[in-house]
């Protein structure tokens, strides 16, 4: 991994820490920020793993990023939960920052966090 890729990975870890520290907060604004940072961790992990396989991705839509990886036939073992909930996670990117009436379940955020942590440290690419 290059120095820049290691720095990028540190951003993912920071997103996961923010999400982990706040997903079960009594403060709804903090929970929404936790969901946003969980989404960012998903997005950035896809992008980092793809880059390590030679594919440079841009954008925020999780399903589009997954499709680009699939179309390029790169093997980054995107977890089933991420694939199945891609649309929901994509919504977290903007809705959790700008729409305080958005409802996000604590357990959904926690599952996303746990899945990314496991995925980030799996395989031989990271």
Language-model region placement:
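Terminal alpha-helical segments
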Residues: 1-126
């Amino acid at each position: 991994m290059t120095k820049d890729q290691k720095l990028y990975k540190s951003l993912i870890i920071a997103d996961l820490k923010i999400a982990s520290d706040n997903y079960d907060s009594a403060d709804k604004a903090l929970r929404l920020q936790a969901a946003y940072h969980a989404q960012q961790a998903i997005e950035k992990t896809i992008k980092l793993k793809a880059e390590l396989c030679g594919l440079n991705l841009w954008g925020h839509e999780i399903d589009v990023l997954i499709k680009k990886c699939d179309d390029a036939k790169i093997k980054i073992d995107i977890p089933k939960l991420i694939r199945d909930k891609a649309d929901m996670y994509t919504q977290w990117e903007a809705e959790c920052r700008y729409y305080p009436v958005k409802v996000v379940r604590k357990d959904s955020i926690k599952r996303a966090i746990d899945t990314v942590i496991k995925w980030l440290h799996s395989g031989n690419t990271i």
